[in-house]
Regions:
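NAD(P)-cofactor binding segment of oxidoreductase domains
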Residues: 72-115
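Conserved Rossmann-fold cofactor-binding substructure of NAD(P)-dependent oxidoreductases
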Residues: 47-73
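Glycine-rich Rossmann-fold phosphate-binding loop(s) that bind the pyrophosphate
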Residues: 13-14, 169
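Catalytic helix-loop patch of NAD(P)-dependent Rossmann-fold dehydrogenases
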Residues: 127-166
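Conserved Rossmann-fold NAD(P)-dependent oxidoreductase catalytic core, especially the SDR/UDP-sugar
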Residues: 100-140
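N-terminal Rossmann-fold NAD(P) dinucleotide-binding loop
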Residues: 17-18
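Conserved N-terminal Rossmann-fold NAD(P)-binding element of oxidoreductases
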Residues: 8-12
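Substrate-positioning beta->alpha
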Residues: 172, 178-182, 191-208
Length: 208
């Protein structure tokens, strides 16, 4: 990791966020991480991260961002999961509402770089062909469409400025998160097409 700001803010400091925080701390950064549960806040504190209790769909919780926004220079990583269909808040509220709320807050700080973690779900192609950064997104479901729209909101912060970046990750796996682990432990068969390919990335590779 090169060319880092003096401080970082990880919005949505969960499974991937904790791995990222550990690497940033190793490089001498002061790291702020947002969580929703007090138990998660304590876990971050034990890592050396300044925990921020925040709900991206609730602007009333945003004053907690003040210490991070006071940094002389700040790198921001937006890692908030999109939520579940039929859940509360809805994926639309989490993805579009969350990004809109947070980006308004970031205008108050000296943000040097902003990275939004999106998903390969924006591509939607399921024919087994090769997909890369130059492939035209063709989301086939609501989640992919919302993520693509959210990417647009993020890039609007400074149009054409490469400091505002989008990273599209595949499914995460790693310690404590193995595809099909629950079924294997219970002795149940893995349901699905045995010839299908899994699109995955290890959490440590994603953090790097």
């Amino acid at each position: 990791m090169a060319d880092l700001a003096s401080e970082s803010l990880i919005v949505g400091c969960g499974y991937l966020g904790r791995s990222l925080a550990e690497r940033l701390l190793e490089h001498g950064q002061r790291v702020h991480g947002t969580v929703r549960q007090r138990s998660d806040a304590e876990a971050l504190r034990c890592l050396g991260v300044n925990p921020v209790m925040l709900e991206v769909t609730r602007p009333l919780s945003f004053p907690a961002l003040a210490p991070a926004l006071e940094a002389e220079e700040l790198d921001v990583y937006y890692l908030v999961p999109p939520g579940r269909s039929g859940g509360v808040p809805t994926p639309r509220q989490v993805i579009l509402g969350g990004i809109a709320h947070i980006t308004r807050q970031l205008r108050q700080g000296a943000v040097r770089r902003g990275v939004l973690v999106s998903s390969t779900a924006v591509y939607g192609q399921a024919s087994g062909g090769r997909v890369d950064a130059d492939t035209l997104p063709q989301p086939g479901g609501e989640r992919g469409r919302l993520l693509l729209e959210g990417e647009g909101l993020w890039r609007e912060q400074d149009e054409g400025d490469p400091r505002w970046r989008v990273v599209r990750l595949a499914g995460l796996y790693g310690a404590g998160r193995i595809v099909g682990e629950k079924a294997v432990r219970e002795g149940a068969p893995l349901v699905g097409d045995p010839e299908a390919l899994l699109n995955l990335i290890h959490v440590q590779d994603a953090a790097d």
